[in-house]
Regions:
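Inter-helical loop and helix-membrane interface segments of multi-pass membrane transporters/permeases
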Residues: 1-7, 13, 52-77, 243-247, ...
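Hydrophobic membrane-spanning alpha-helices of multi-pass integral membrane proteins
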Residues: 223-235, 262-265, 289-310, 337-342
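Terminal cytosolic tails of multi-pass membrane transporters
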Residues: 267-291, 309-378
Length: 378
């Protein structure tokens, strides 16, 4: 299983390495499989709920399920937002590859908005259908059954589609959808981060080797391979930890915290960058100032709240607990993962600042700096 996971990342890295067109076409296939199968699953489940053939314990769909004021406490709300930020991560890939789109001034923004809408509708439909079909009971196929938590779609898929040959065929397609989703997630982790390190290298924030472009595929070679290699290293580290599955779950929470941090920072940066335009029109004030800044504040507040919850074992919604050496404090696993990641990031920051001081002295990137495009390697 470990070897399969490593080979999986290698294959996804190679696809990203081969070019943006190959990656985009592969992503279309994966996304198409996901959306079609989730739609078929959801509609079939809702039809069975409607005609009374769903398993005992099914529920009638209710619009009240979307009411945030029905959430039991604010901590659960904050944790849910951070989790959704993690789920959304990767759907903004078009923004990271904007220079490689046909219309870099409009297409990435439209794609980001469209992808957000598609993700929202898809998740709402699947959640409504699965909660209606399975109910929240703690036995059988109920969503409250902890034994179903690791493979909800597979368990519900067998019941939704039935045991007929065609139903079995759809169930296997659903499992293929899960596999394609894993592939798409891996690809949308490597692809945008490679472009981020490419941009950082072009402006000399990190070593210039990360700015190398393949002469034929026109992809960032070192950046792509490095991101794939880091993914493998993290995967191996998680696998060989004392509580592998639990640590992976905590890593998801910790990554969500960092995504909330840098999404929030992006909102602040947007408001600051366009600060001179804010008084020119009401639209600019809202779209370039108030909304990005408010979004940044909300994400930082919820992220900070979640960090505090993850620090205290009594309130942490984590998968593991860790005891701090010498002082014997018990803290949540997500907090530990977040702190370790922060220490690694701080060390990398000082290393790059010492090796590449020009960027940190604002000599390579200012407001007036033109967009730099690296030449492909010959």
């Amino acid at each position: 299983m470990l070897l399969v996971g490593v080979l999986w990342i290698v294959v996804m890295t190679y696809i990203c390495y081969r070019g943006i067109e190959v990656s985009a076409n592969f992503q279309k296939i994966l996304l198409g499989i996901e959306l079609v199968m989730l739609l078929v699953l959801s509609v079939t489940a809702l039809v069975k709920v409607g005609n009374g053939t769903a398993p005992p314990g099914h529920l009638t769909p209710s619009i009240s399920w979307l009411n945030p004021f029905h959430i039991s406490n604010f901590s659960a709300f904050a944790s849910g937002i951070i989790l959704m930020v993690f789920i959304y991560w990767g759907w903004d890939t078009a923004v990271s590859v904007n220079e490689e789109t046909k219309d870099k001034n409009k297409t990435p923004g439209r794609a980001a908005i469209l992808s957000t809408f598609i993700l929202l509708v898809t998740y709402a439909l699947v959640i409504f259908s699965m909660q209606s079909f399975a109910g929240i009971k703690t036995t059988g196929n109920g969503l409250g059954n902890i034994h179903n938590a690791g493979d909800v779609l597979s368990i519900q898929g067998h019941l939704v589609f039935g045991t007929t040959p065609f139903g079995s065929f759809l169930t296997h397609l659903l499992l293929l959808m899960v596999l394609s989703s894993a592939a798409a997630s891996t690809q949308t982790t490597i692809l945008p981060t490679a472009r981020t390190t490419l941009s950082m290298a072009v402006y000399k924030a990190i070593p210039s080797a990360f700015a190398k472009i393949h002469h034929r595929y026109l992809t960032p070679t070192v950046s792509t391979i490095a991101m794939g290699g880091i993914s493998i290293a993290v995967y191996l580290l998680m696998h060989y930890s004392s509580n592998g599955i639990g640590v992976i779950g905590d890593a998801v929470i910790a990554i969500g915290l960092y995504i909330a941090f840098y999404y929030g920072l992006t909102g602040f940066a947007c408001a600051w960058y366009y600060r001179r335009n804010l008084t020119s029109s009401a639209r600019n004030l809202w779209m370039q100032g108030i909304i990005p800044f408010a979004g940044g504040l909300i994400l930082w507040f919820l992220g900070g709240w979640s960090v505090w919850l993850d620090y205290d074992v009594a309130t942490a919604n984590d998968y593991t607990m860790w005891t701090v050496p010498w002082i014997h404090w018990q803290v949540g696993g997500a907090f530990v993962v977040a702190v370790i990641a922060a220490l690694v990031g701080i060390a990398a920051y000082f290393y790059c600042k010492i090796r590449n001081p020009a960027f940190f002295k604002k000599q390579t990137l200012t407001r007036s700096t033109e967009t730099l495009v690296p030449d492909p390697d010959t």
